[in-house]
Amino acid sequence: MERNLRKTRVGRVVSDKMDKTITVLVEDFVRHPLYGKAVKRTKKFKAHDEMNECRIGDRVRIMETKPLSKDKRWRLVQIVEKAK
C-alpha cells in the first residue's frame, strides 16, 4: 500500500488529557456554492501520539492510518510549531 495516498491535515491540539491520544482541531475555509462567502468549517480528529510529546496549543500535522480504536484513525506525523 502506498503511503502517499493517505490524507494529511494540519491543525491545533485542543486536548492532550488522554494517554497517547490528542484531539486536533482542523479549520477549513470553503466557499458557499451560491453566495460565494468564505465559511469556516471546523472538525476535531483524535490522533495517536506515541511519545506523549504534544501539548495544548501546538500546531501539528496528522496522517490517516488504520483504525486504532473506536474513534482514532489518525496518527501524529510532526509538530509544526510548539505552543508559546
Swiss-Prot record:
Alphabetical list of InterPro entries matching this protein: NA-bd_OB-fold (IPR012340), Ribosomal_uS17 (IPR000266), Ribosomal_uS17_bact/chlr (IPR019984), Ribosomal_uS17_CS (IPR019979)
Record GO terms (molecular function): rRNA binding; structural constituent of ribosome
Keywords, comma-separated and alphabetical: Ribonucleoprotein, Ribosomal protein, RNA-binding, rRNA-binding
A Pfam family hit: Ribosomal_S17
GO cellular component, one term: cytosolic small ribosomal subunit
Alphabetical list of SUPFAM superfamilies matching this protein: Nucleic acid-binding proteins (SSF50249)
UniProt GO BP: translation
Family in the record: Belongs to the universal ribosomal protein uS17 family.
Purpose: One of the primary rRNA binding proteins, it binds specifically to the 5'-end of 16S ribosomal RNA.
Subunit structure, interactors included: Part of the 30S ribosomal subunit.
Protein name: Small ribosomal subunit protein uS17
Annotated organism of origin: Alkaliphilus oremlandii (strain OhILAs) (Clostridium oremlandii (strain OhILAs))
